[in-house]
Curated annotation (Swiss-Prot):
Cofactor: Zn(2+)
GO biological process terms on file: base-excision repair
Family from the record: Belongs to the FPG family.
Quaternary data: Monomer.
Protein name, as recorded: Formamidopyrimidine-DNA glycosylase
Signal peptide: none
Binding site for DNA: 103, 122, 165
Stated role: Involved in base excision repair of DNA damaged by oxidation or by mutagenic agents. Acts as a DNA glycosylase that recognizes and removes damaged bases. Has a preference for oxidized purines, such as 7,8-dihydro-8-oxoguanine (8-oxoG). Has AP (apurinic/apyrimidinic) lyase activity and introduces nicks in the DNA strand. Cleaves the DNA backbone by beta-delta elimination to generate a single-strand break at the site of the removed base with both 3'- and 5'-phosphates.
Cofactor note: Binds 1 zinc ion per subunit.
């Protein structure tokens, strides 16, 4: 499933094409994806100008000029591609699919002549429309925690969120009501860089005074560092993720621990090897020698 860096990569690819453009038409090719499309979905979007394209956790949010927001989620295998107006281009096998490819479920045609195509083989993505004024109270967003990409996440924030929690540090980081948008890959990578075990109690990052420990400060910085590097690399393409130009992300080539069980630990001076355990039904990859 695309995690925050993959969704942010898609947002940055769509933003220069969509923001300021007007939607000429919407070609909705099936009645549902993970959930049914909103009633009169094409009619409600046709003629609307896109004022901004944001992201909250793993959701893309297109602000429209009538006060509504188009909410988009990529699910397991969803992707967007941009087709600019002009002659069709011949693409390599590793490039974007041709026009009207299999599993193209929604096509947004802009007044510029360009097209934004949503492709989703497994159909776990979805799209909804909500009023911007009601978004904070919307069921999808009202329980989301802090954003980890940006200044909202800090050692003090982690100390406040994790105070008194006996759950594992990894489970706490994956709890979307605490930190929104983190997934298994980037939690494993951030914990390794921070030298913290996924099995450590989350509450151990908070002092009795409620202030953050040095570990909390280090972890907050490391999470942001890993996410920023992943976005710069276009995300991680393990199965379905592609950027809006059809290119694959390449952060998977920078993994230190994820999916690297039995490999030597890459931490300088560490003689351990990467272990794989299961936590909450998910694989955790870490080095027991240098992650404490």
């Amino acid at each position: 499933m695309p995690e925050l860096p993959e969704v942010e990569t898609v947002r940055r690819g769509l933003e220069p094409v969509m923001v300021g453009a007007r939607i000429l038409s919407v070609d909705q090719r099936r009645p549902d994806l993970r959930f049914p499309f909103p009633d009169r979905f094409p009619e409600r979007l046709a003629g609307r100008r896109i004022l901004a394209l944001g992201r909250r956790a793993k959701y893309l949010l297109a602000d429209l000029d009538d006060g509504d927001v188009l909410i988009m989620h990529l699910g397991m295998s969803g992707s967007f591609r941009v087709e600019q107006a002009g002659p069709a281009k011949t693409l390599s096998p590793r490039g974007a699919p041709p026009k009207n490819a299999a599993h193209d479920h929604v096509v947004f045609t802009l007044t510029s002549g360009g097209r934004i195509v949503y492709n989703d083989p497994r159909r776990f993505g979805f799209m909804q429309i909500a009023a911007r004024a009601d978004l904070a109270a919307h069921p999808l967003f009202r329980s989301l925690g802090v954003e980890p990409l940006g200044n909202e996440l800090s050692g003090a924030a982690l100390a406040r969120l994790f105070a008194g929690k006996t759950t594992s540090l990894k489970a706490a980081l994956l709890d979307q009501s605490l930190v929104a948008g983190l997934g298994n890959i980037y939690v494993c990578e951030a914990l390794h860089r921070a030298g913290l075990s996924p099995l450590r109690q989350a509450g151990s990052l908070t002092k009795k005074s409620g202030r953050p420990t040095e570990r909390a400060n280090r972890l907050a910085d490391t999470i942001r560092e890993v996410l920023e590097e992943a976005v710069a690399a276009g995300g991680s393409s393990l199965r379905d993720h592609r950027q809006t130009n059809g290119a694959l992300g390449y952060f998977q080539h920078n993994f230190r621990v994820y999916d690297r069980a039995l490999h030597p630990c890459p931490t300088p001076g560490c003689k351990g090897e990467i272990s794989r355990i299961t936590q909450g039904g998910r694989s955790s990859f870490f080095c027991s020698m240098c992650q404490k």
